[in-house]
Curated annotation (Swiss-Prot):
One of its GO terms (biological process) is positive regulation of protein depolymerization. Residues 27-31 are lumenal. The gene is SLN. GO terms for molecular function: ATPase binding; enzyme inhibitor activity. Disulfide bonds: none annotated. This is Sarcolipin. It is a single-pass membrane protein. GO terms for cellular component: membrane; sarcoplasmic reticulum; sarcoplasmic reticulum membrane. The chain crosses the membrane at residues 8-26. Homooligomer. Can also form heterooligomers with other sarcoplasmic/endoplasmic reticulum calcium ATPase (SERCA) regulators ARLN, ERLN, PLN and STRIT1/DWORF. Monomer. Interacts with calcium ATPase ATP2A1/SERCA1. Interacts as a monomer with ATP2A2/SERCA2; the interaction decreases ATP2A2 Ca(2+) affinity. Interacts with VMP1; VMP1 competes with PLN and SLN to prevent them from forming an inhibitory complex with ATP2A2. It is found in: Sarcoplasmic reticulum membrane; Endoplasmic reticulum membrane. Keywords: Endoplasmic reticulum, Membrane, Sarcoplasmic reticulum, Transmembrane, Transmembrane helix. Residues 1-7 are cytoplasmic. The lineage of its organism: Eukaryota, Metazoa, Chordata, Craniata, Vertebrata.
């Protein structure tokens, strides 16, 4: 159970970082 929760949290963090990076790229591209 702990390992699955840890993997889920890891995946969520990776997705969050990717979304933030993409948002920053789009924002800097627009300006």
């Amino acid at each position: 159970m702990g390992i699955n929760t840890r993997e889920l949290f890891l995946n969520f963090t990776i997705v969050l970082i990717t979304v933030i990076l993409m948002w920053l790229l789009v924002r800097s591209y627009q300006y």
